[in-house]
């Protein structure tokens, strides 16, 4: 349950930051979740290369919170609420937010596991190693199970599970 709570809070931070940035730069908020997540993955990648992957996760969380703080100071709470209302009126942004919440709730209820050789199992091996070790999986040259997985998939999973035990469904 804590995994779900953390994921939903992170999603709130992410979407709120997108709404505030969209207000600041007069962009559609639907354009921002992918670049913001990509930027988070770049930060995690650079910190992972340096051996500080968990520090990178904290840096991403602090950066998202900083956008909220700047937004609350610059636009006041009423302005941030207006930015949220404008963001919620954009169908693609609402679809992103609603779809993410739906997937998280679905996985929380069903809690799928890596039990067979399917796409879900193949995709999940590398993120599992990254989350459990707090480092890239290539640090162990003996274990080649996840050598085919791109680092970004592992890092985006790590962003949503940087602390605590690994949960396959999360």
Kindly give the residue locations of the regions a language model identified.
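Active-site lumenal/periplasmic loops and adjacent helix-entry segments of GT-C-fold
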Residues: 102-170
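Generic serine detector
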Residues: 28, 38, 89-92, 147, ...
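Membrane-embedded, hydrophobic transmembrane alpha-helices
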Residues: 1-87
């Amino acid at each position: 349950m804590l995994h779900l709570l953390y994921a939903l809070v992170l999603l709130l931070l992410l979407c709120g930051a997108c709404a505030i940035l969209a207000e600041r730069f007069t962009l559609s908020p639907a354009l921002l979740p992918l670049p913001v997540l990509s930027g988070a993955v770049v930060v995690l990648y650079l910190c992972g290369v340096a051996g500080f992957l968990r520090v990178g996760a904290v840096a991403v969380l602090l950066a998202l919170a900083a956008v909220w703080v700047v937004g609350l100071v610059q636009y006041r709470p009423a302005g941030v609420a207006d930015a949220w209302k404008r963001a919620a009126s954009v169908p693609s942004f609402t679809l992103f937010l609603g779809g993410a919440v739906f997937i998280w709730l679905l996985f929380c209820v069903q809690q799928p596991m890596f039990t067979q050789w399917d796409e879900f199992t193949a995709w999940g091996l590398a993120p599992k190693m990254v989350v459990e070790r707090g480092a890239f999986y290539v640090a162990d040259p003996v274990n080649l199970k996840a050598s085919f997985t791109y680092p970004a998939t592992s890092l985006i999973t790590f962003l949503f599970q940087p602390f605590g035990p690994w949960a396959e469904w999360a």
